Amino acid sequence: MNPQSSPYQTCSALTLAEALPLDPHGPLYQGAFAYLNQESTAYQDGWPFTVESNDGYPHAPWMGYDPKRNDAESFGLNLGLARQILTHDCKDAALKAKAERIVKKSLDLLFTQEDFGEMGVDTFCGWLKQLDKLPQSAYSQDQIQERIVTLIEKRVERDPERWKVYTPRPSYFVRSRTDAAYPRLKALVEAELDYLIDTCPENDVWEIPWSWFGLYPEAFQVARTWWKSWKAIENLAFLMAFDRIEPVKKGNENHE
């Protein structure tokens, strides 16, 4: 895997840091912001989805450098990075201004188009709990929330038979009962909770729903193990948020 930094890896790291959560004044956030502010990382008005250095190391097929893929997929990446910049006390005025321009343009597109690439709706969803931190626009917070939830309803995969492959499950958009999309996806959320319980192997964790299609087989096995761990933590957190995991009762542990 590419040991060099990339905007996509940076976004993934910041998403994990936010979930933990880590101190936004700490070295991870500040280092990420410094990296994103480098002229060498820029792509058009934001950052690229793929970088040329990826091709020198084992990588997923969709992460090979591809200018056309950058045009199609950088929207969601840029919106996600802009949210991290604007909601985690970034002190760099130029970087904040860049992030605000990205978000303002994204809000205009939110109401005028349907296709936002693979990550677009997911990253719009990330804003639902932080609408008060959006830059000023012509749209109210209620209008923005309604439009995002509508897009989520259109994007979510409703067929449980399709959840075994890489599709946007309900848990991509709803992580707790307080999430904005939960009332409209409640039945689907309950179905996925059942699905996770029913499909968890007895002596393992869930398999990831994607592959590298035979590319870099040895490196893929390493990446597969990492991703299985990450997705297992996500799934357990999802189950816990909806009270689907019974707590261990103290005094009943088996020490044999």
List where the protein language model places each region.
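Accessory, usually C-terminal, subdomains that scaffold auxiliary metal cofactors
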Residues: 147-150, 154, 168-229
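Well-ordered alpha-helical scaffold segments within catalytic/enzyme domains
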Residues: 11-24, 80-91, 123-137, 171-185, ...
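Solvent-exposed loop and edge beta-strand segments that line ligand/cofactor-binding
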Residues: 1-11, 62-76, 108-121, 157-165, ...
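Phosphate-rich cofactor/ligand-interacting catalytic cores and adjacent structured alpha/beta frameworks
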Residues: 59-62, 71, 76, 83, ...
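Long, well-ordered core segments of solenoidal/helical folds
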Residues: 1, 27-47, 92-115, 143-161, ...
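Extended ligand-binding groove/face enriched in aromatic
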Residues: 1-100
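Ser/Thr/Asn(+Pro)-rich, low-complexity disordered segments
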Residues: 1-8, 12, 131-154, 244-246, ...
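Long, positively charged, glycine-interspersed low-complexity recognition regions
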Residues: 213-256
